[in-house]
Amino acid sequence: KEVSTAPKIAIIGAGPAGLYAALRAIEAGLKPIVFERGKDVRERRRDLAKINKEQLVNPESNYCFGEGGAGTYSDGKLYTRSKKRGNVLKGLEWLVHFGADEDILVDAHPHIGTNKLPKVISAMREAIIAAGGEVHFNAKLTDLHIENKVLKGIEINKQKQYAFDEVVLATGHSARDIFYLLHNKGVKIEAKPFALGVRAEHQQEVINYIQYHGETNNPYLPPAAYSLVEQVDGMGVYSFCMCPGGIIAPCATQQEEVVTNGWSPSKRNNPYANSGIVVSVEPKDLPNYTPDDPFVSLNFQKEVERACWIAGGKTQQVPAQ
């Protein structure tokens, strides 16, 4: 559809949720205007290089923020264990339309690959613009204009004002400032359970040997994966985001914190495998828990990430490897 003159809707964030929201808006006959705090895929790579080479984190452009969000450099695994997912075929078909392999439509555990995702993400953006939508980079939401509990508009970069009746917040996991903004505007938010843990790395040959009962380099078998679930002291411990033939990467959004993520290229041909090993954490189990503090989980998360930064010598290196 051509929507350049259609009613407008603001979408905050150009990650997976924001890009899909923009495409759905176009289907519904609305003009999406996407505001992304980070940079486009090409410009974003320079900031990623600074993290890897100089250990310098740009808080607005990093492995989490920028075109495609964390998804652009996060493997492209499309499998979820959630039972609330509904019919995901439409989303998979869109990804194929924009450049992903058709195999993802039939694979049990579909996977695109970090090396292929940037082109897919860029193609999605180009399609949004071609249909009459807009995508703005280096455009951070800094305020919401609310009158009598009714949204009237938004502020970008503490400078530009835009009138909108409807805004989609597709800001993702790491945009903590959005939660504080909502709280300050009187929007009810509350702490929720989350998962916390470490990322374990193994030689891929070892995982192959275990999972394939002695096979390590059979050319007819893909690099092996695993799934781990256990109860420890009444708490669920489980593997998450298992990456065969992958790498571990730094995903902090602030200089003084350490966060890790993992992903694989499309061929999953790196010599190491990795997986998050996490525990389910309830807000009531946290040391400073009070029922009226909506930020108790966020504050605990920040404390852990800063403690890892200190333990790692105040660099972006992990404390132990």
Give the ranges of each region predicted by the language model.
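Residues forming the flavin
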Residues: 1-94, 98-321
